[in-house]
Swiss-Prot record:
It comes from the Bacteria. The lineage of its organism: Bacteria, Bacillati, Actinomycetota, Actinomycetes, Mycobacteriales. This is Low molecular weight protein-tyrosine phosphatase A. It comes from Mycobacterium tuberculosis (strain ATCC 25618 / H37Rv). One of its GO terms (biological process) is symbiont-mediated suppression of host phagosome acidification. The UIM-like region mediates binding to host ubiquitin.
Length: 163
């Protein structure tokens, strides 16, 4: 049995955007029967919130949409940098990951998976200083991009063969 495919989401503090994406994507994969085939993690580029729960507003939006909320913030480390795919929530995160030595082919912007993002900026705006509606907007942006990420996973799993 081969190791599971590893996808990690990266934002600034790992308490808002990346844990939302992680929880949403991981649950969707479990519902598709791929929970053992794909490992989903998240991390922040900074260490300010290491060990903290997700922001209560992020957790509230996840809970309202039926997603789990258990989370402990982490800073990007060796485990995350070794992921098959590192999904950056904004351009600064992508740049930092490349500066840390991650090959450009393994770094993607989350919104690049949403074909409807078109002319919109690829950044997912940080809702930290916003209100509930900003967190709902982040949820909607993530939700729109995840089908494309599922397609990426399906293609990788098909190419790599069954685990």
């Amino acid at each position: 049995m081969s190791d599971p495919l590893h996808v990690t989401f990266v934002c600034t503090g790992n308490i808002c955007r990346s844990p939302m994406a992680e929880k949403m994507f991981a649950q969707q994969l479990r519902h598709r029967g791929l929970g053992d085939a794909v490992r989903v993690t998240s991390a922040g580029t900074g260490n300010w919130h290491v060990g903290s729960c997700a922001d209560e507003r992020a957790a509230g939006v996840l809970r309202a949409h039926g997603y789990p909320t258990d989370h402990r913030a982490a800073q990007v480390g060796t485990e995350h940098l070794a992921a098959d795919l590192l999904v950056a929530l904004d351009r600064n995160h992508a740049r930092l990951l490349r500066q840390l030595g991650v090959e450009a082919a393994r770094v993607r912007m989350l919104r690049s998976f949403d074909p409807r993002s078109g002319t919109h900026a690829l950044d997912v705006e940080d809702p930290y200083y916003g209100d509930h509606s900003d967190f709902e907007e982040v949820f909607a942006v993530i939700e729109s991009a995840l089908p494309g990420l599922h397609d990426w996973v399906d293609e990788r799993l098909a190419r790599n063969g069954p685990s």
